[in-house]
Design a protein with these regions (language model features):
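Structural signature of the two symmetry-related core transmembrane helices
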Residues: 1-15, 266-281, 362
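Hydrophobic core of transmembrane alpha-helices in multi-pass small-molecule transporters
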Residues: 9-13, 20-43, 51, 290-304
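Helix-to-loop junctions at the C-terminal end of transmembrane segments
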Residues: 87, 251-264, 348-349
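Juxtamembrane intracellular "pre-TM" segments in multi-pass secondary transporters
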Residues: 125-211, 228
Length: 387
């Protein structure tokens, strides 16, 4: 699946470099999972997260996700710098903007091919661990079944009474209960989660709210805002977001240390909440230098919740449900993030409204932080319970 995703990425890059048809571009962007935020989105992220969780211990999981986030942020930073610098250099040679951008997306396609090659050389240990989780779950069920069989042999009269009681209870429950049970079983089969479903669905709703707010200020929109407000050129924009992503990546390592001391939820909220206050302050800055400074300070703490969030999802669900949980929460975030750009496009066409996306994003994300703390401060991952 990861190789397939890389091939789709390469195909999308080729499509963007070779056609101007809007519908084909929309199709390529959707199937190729092109992210306007500069960060990975789509169904393949859940596979990576589940595989990582299965090959590390609970105690080291958050630290591993921190390094995972750091690697992604460094790559995003280099991409922002390379994209801005390359575009600026090509335009300096009298190349018009559109052809210069096409050269950049062709490089994106080449990287997709390289990624497919690297995935092909990936160790099978991750998939083996997922299979072990499924085997362990099956072994547990078989053990429980054998225990029930042994108890039936040893205590026939007691189990006869219990069976009679269960039969009467089922009769009283009636058709409605049977339909409800069938519906729950069907839902579990479709979603891939059973016991973790309440937690996963509640987290998904909160993550969708956070992503909806974040969709107002994704990096491409923030870059365009700097262009509209201060007339910043592509090369300078590339440098700004290079350093922003560098700071974001380095902060992930600090997040793992804070989580080890204070807990995942407290770390998520304590770092994310101040960053959203800074987000609201960005458009209030009177000069480019101050706006960039506030943005960089925000990036230095805003991504601390990413490795802790990923680790928390993997911690509070059963091992065999991790891929499904990561997929469901990831889809929720993707759906939330796809709605807000519709409003941003409208606001950016009106000079009086170009600052509003920052205010909306900051407010919604602060609301997410408060709700997350209220709902999950008592739901602790295994490594925190054992301490």
């Amino acid at each position: 699946m990861l190789i397939f995703g890389a091939v789709l990425m390469a195909g999308a890059g080729i499509a963007f470099a070779s056609t101007r048809n809007l519908w084909l571009l929309l199709l390529a962007g959707t199937i190729g999972v092109i992210s306007p935020s500069g960060h990975e989105v789509g169904p393949f992220l859940s596979i990576e997260q589940a595989a990582l969780s299965d090959v590390v211990t609970d105690r080291t999981r958050t630290e591993v996700f921190a390094w995972y986030t750091l690697a992604g942020s460094l790559a995003t930073a280099l991409g922002a710098l390379a994209g801005g610098t390359l575009t600026h250099a090509l335009r300096a040679t009298s190349m018009t903007p559109v052809p210069s951008y096409r050269m950049v997306v062709m490089l994106y396609a080449v990287l997709g091919v390289l990624l497919a090659f690297l995935f092909a050389r990936l160790s099978p240990a991750a998939e083996a661990s997922i299979l072990r989780s499924q085997s362990n779950a099956l072994a547990t069920l078989q053990h429980e079944e054998r225990s029930r069989t042994n108890n039936t042999k040893r205590k026939p009269f007691f189990l006869y009474l219990r069976a009679l009681r269960d039969f009467v209870s089922r009769r009283r429950a009636g058709t409605a209960s049977r339909r409800k049970g069938a519906f729950r079983a069907t839902l579990a089969g479709l979603s891939g989660i059973d016991r973790s479903r309440p937690v996963v669905f509640k987290l998904s709703g909160l993550f969708a709210l956070d992503a909806f707010g974040g969709g107002f200020v994704i990096q491409s929109f923030a870059a365009y805002w700097f262009y509209l407000r201060f007339g910043v050129n592509p090369g300078t924009l590339g440098a700004i977001f290079f350093w922003a992503n560098i700071f974001a990546g380095l902060s992930a390592l600090l997040a793992s240390r804070l989580a080890a001391r204070f807990g995942l939820i407290k770390t998520m909220v304590a770092t994310h909440l101040p960053s959203n206050i800074l987000l609201i302050l960005v458009p209030l800055m009177p000069t480019l230098s101050l706006a960039v400074l506030v943005l960089l300070v925000r990036f230095s703490i805003s991504q601390m919740d990413v490795p802790t969030r990923q680790s928390y999802i993997m911690a509070v669900v059963r091992p065999e449900e991790r891929s499904a949980a990561a997929g469901i929460t990831g889809v929720a975030r993707t759906i939330g993030a796809t709605i807000s750009p519709l409003f941003v496009g409208f606001m950016f066409t009106r000079p009086a409204l170009i600052n509003v996306p920052f205010f909306i994003a900051g407010t919604l994300k602060i609301l997410y932080d408060l709700l997350l703390y209220r709902e999950f401060i008592t739901v602790r991952p295994p490594e925190e319970v054992r301490e």
